[in-house]
């Protein structure tokens, strides 16, 4: 049976804006209050997804969240008609309105953690939505994320869906952005690398001092238990607190893995060699640890270019390719390094560049935009086929974006009641295109 690593990219929602909501994310903060282009953002994301499908990859899409989130605004005390709720929130608590209008669900690396059937005791693919408790604008996502995942991976024979972890800082969980699966082949049992920023139950353990550590060891361990993973298939590794304080808010900003390759910056982790030895022992097959030194690429250049927020994919030919943002081409040190990397004798033989600048300006590169799901042929066939990218879906979704999305949006536009109507009309139509059923509260 054939095995694949599918990528499910988040569709950019109609309210894509630059409100600077993500403390600890340098790009998000530095581009706050700029005018965004939701239509361009959505089309950039679709083009990247279609390009991977054209390379022969299994590529899907995940629907965005309903925004503005009027249910949360009502829950925190704003009342009246929908228009009045928006107006009151804009006047009395604009920061809360901004949080309830974020299109951050486009970054599906934070949607959930996924364990493939080859690793789990019950032989099913397991999904746990991330609770994202560290950021208000993302903490309101998990319930709808779970609905969308269940409508996308909608066969109980093959897929097991869990509730997100308890909504408390001790279980801060940011999903697949802090999780990489290493294996010899996608269909073979692998090693799941869980990376955390702090141990919540040990106040004396190392942790960052400037920016928050969004992932706890306790959360990573809980997900491993839920997913029925054996101890021999898990490694828990701490991210270096110093790089979190330099703007590396998720591990996928400082390392990325695929199959038997882990591409990482030398400052990425604590206790690096001991943990790499554990990975080698548990993998029991050849591993390529591709280290980038500070001399080659500084942390600042890595964060600004998103060198590590790239995707590493295995092409049908068997070669590995890096899917990088065009920002990597524009950074001389990073571009020089990537040109050298393909000559170093690792499995990485190609680099392909894509323009995802609308996402990058909010702090999300190619790796943020996708959720990886390793599956066999039967599991791929059990996925909701309407969510898988092909020429027809690409055309339908581009037409849908043209019909419903604005080409500019400012933070002040978020108080426009028309945005509610536009967004709900768009999402209602999208659920019909993708055959998701009623995943949104306004449809129930």
UniProtKB/Swiss-Prot annotation:
The lineage of its organism: Bacteria, Pseudomonadati, Pseudomonadota, Gammaproteobacteria, Alteromonadales. It comes from the Bacteria. Keywords: Arginine metabolism, Hydrolase. This is N-succinylarginine dihydrolase. It holds the Pfam family AstB. Substrate binds at residues 19-28, 110, 137-138, 214, 252, 362. Belongs to the succinylarginine dihydrolase family. PANTHER family: N-SUCCINYLARGININE DIHYDROLASE. Homodimer. The gene is astB. It catalyses: N(2)-succinyl-L-arginine + 2 H2O + 2 H(+) = N(2)-succinyl-L-ornithine + 2 NH4(+) + CO2. Its EC number is 3.5.3.23. Catalyzes the hydrolysis of N(2)-succinylarginine into N(2)-succinylornithine, ammonia and CO(2). It is an enzyme of class 3 (hydrolase). The active site is at residues 174, 250, 368. GO terms for molecular function: N-succinylarginine dihydrolase activity. Pathway: Amino-acid degradation; L-arginine degradation via AST pathway; L-glutamate and succinate from L-arginine: step 2/5. InterPro entries: AstB_sf (IPR037031), SuccinylArg_d-Hdrlase_AstB (IPR007079). GO terms for biological process: arginine catabolic process to glutamate; arginine catabolic process to succinate.
